[in-house]
Amino acid sequence: MKKSEIEDKKTLSSWYNYSGPEDDVILSSRIKLVRNLADFPFVVKASKMDKERICSIICDAFNQKEEYAYIKKSDISDFGRQILFDKNILPLDPKFDFSGLFLSSGENLYALLNNKEHLKLIAFASGFQPEYLMQEIYKLDEYLQSKLQFAASYEFGYLTSQLKDCGTGMKLSLRIFIPSTVIQNAFTDLIKYLKDRHFSIKSVFENSARNCIFDIFPETSFDGSELDQLAEMQALGTYILKTERKFRSKLADNNSTIVLDLVKKMYVMGMNALLLDYSEVEEILNAIKLGLQLGILSGIEESELNALYYTTKDGHLIYLIDNYSFSYEDDIKNSLSMQIQRLRAVVVQQAMGKIIFK
């Protein structure tokens, strides 16, 4: 297999292919808005007929939104579920219960039906864009409010089956890349800072040897208005940006040989491996991103590296394998898992081939 075989193959259209503000540290922003229809039981208590009626009512409301496509749960194949999992839309667990989902043409906003709540609206954007996401999702919410009656009260706000989601029903979250904070042993201080402000932090790649990508999110939606929550997330994101960049500067000054060794080792691995599993790609991308930020290398953009976290996942690679013809070495051409690892290595090498060390 040669790198030239995939140079003309377009990637699946999605939000993560675009650059965003401050995306050296804040890889992406996410917003979730939950709603329940008035006069219907929560999903956990709803009958099959209730769920069908809820689904029908919400689908009718979406009928005039041509930019959304509806996908029934029963119509999602194993491959389709893998694609949706790779895009952080659905888990792989077949027991994950829902009726269907609406997906926007840009794949940056989707609506999940009958999963714990009657309706979950979720949107993504590259970089640090919580305010933009809030504006986008509330445009859709305002439209739906004109078509649907949502369950709410003056005392508790929007009513949900999970008490922590009552109130605004909104949760903002950020995916952050903080290798310098971790390497400089300041991660524990960050956890305390977040906990004191009622935020949680979770590793994205739990099997990674060097965890440095995390999701941060509020513990509850109940405190404050939407604008209060937005202001808090903006302040938190700004703090993380300043903290990581401060430790990045210290890292460059005090650990230059160690960091250069790590970056070059991962570069050599990425450029010479014939087979790569996803955990190895995580390590390579983390190191190359750090090298780019420290000025060790050039020739590749933050947005390209951020997109590779998604486009090297199994679902995207299976899509390429199913839709294009590639030539494989004789000993792997009959093994899909080996073809995926081989193609993953080629995708990484195509992107990294432009890198220049300074």
Residue map of PLM features:
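Short glycine-/aliphatic-rich beta-strand segments at the starts of folded cytosolic domains
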Residues: L172-I178
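Long, Pro/Ser/Thr-rich low-complexity/intrinsically disordered regulatory tracts in eukaryotic proteins
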Residues: M1-E155, Q162, M170, Q184, ...
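Active-site His/Glu-centered metal-binding helix of metallohydrolases
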Residues: C166
